[in-house]
């Protein structure tokens, strides 16, 4: 399993997390946080390596 951390504006990260969950991935979300420069949250993904490689290759084909 691979684990990634994605940070960003709360709304954008939340939307991404929703899409990933609908695609069948395991997603854990942090509580929203605020620091001097931004407000956001983090999502943690537990991904199967084969699924990740397939997803990356499919996206590379879409965006040459």
Question: What does each model-identified segment do?
Answer:
Residues 1-64:
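Long, contiguous binding/interaction regions
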